[in-house]
Amino acid sequence: RLLSRGLGDVYKRQVILAASTHKEEDEIVIEAFKDLKQEKLFQGHFVLAPRHPERAKDLQNICLRFGLNSRLYTNKQSFDDVDITIINVIGVMDDLFQRSRVTFMGGSLIKRGGHNLIEPAYFGSPILIGPHTFNFEEIVDEFISSDAALLVRNKIELVNAYRDVIQDENLATSLSSNAKNIIKKRRGSTVIQLSYIMDIIRNK
């Protein structure tokens, strides 16, 4: 698989993912990764998948500012030398969601309207989401009210939510199960179909 080739040994390790992030929230996410790394909570690997992969090298510079070593997904650098892998290709998100212990969905800590929760939910990754989700308001509200995703409003809450899911297997399982129940209940519904359509339309 593409992911196993690009992530090597990390393919078999726990992945902490931030997906579809935008320029204005990258520093928030990277600083959250730094805080978690300093706590030494887990033996996994941080993965950052920006909404626009062409920004990957800019994200490496931000990592350096925070004292974190990073590598691009397409780079064969050893994982022993890096803290974060930055995804700079398309076509690997399904595999990432399957491997992720927990996923923050970007575009939601800033006023971009969020992104589709259905994919990470389908693959069983517990979901964290920011407050700015007006593009997907109905489905996000259902996820939050059904305890199928955790709402985070800032960096501190993001760190706390990542930590909670990493440390609490019951919480992780509950979030994943509740999200899958929503998808099962809504299968074929207009809301689910519109979620995919809106994510394509607002891919900016």
Predicted ranges, named:
Residues 1-11:
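Single conserved hydrophobic/aromatic residue that forms the stacking wall/gate
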Residues 186-204:
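C-terminal alpha-helical cap of glycosyltransferases
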Residues 55, 88, 92, 157:
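Short acidic active-site motifs
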Residues 98-181:
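Catalytic binding pocket for nucleotide-activated donors in carbohydrate/polymer assembly enzymes
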Residues 71-117:
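Donor nucleotide-activated moiety binding/catalytic core segment of transferases
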Residues 9-53:
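Active-site donor-nucleotide binding/catalytic segment of nucleotide-sugar enzymes
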Residues 47-87:
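Catalytic donor nucleotide-activated moiety binding site of glycosyltransferases and closely related
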Residues 32-39, 58, 62-66, 142, ...:
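Alpha-helical structural signal in soluble globular domains
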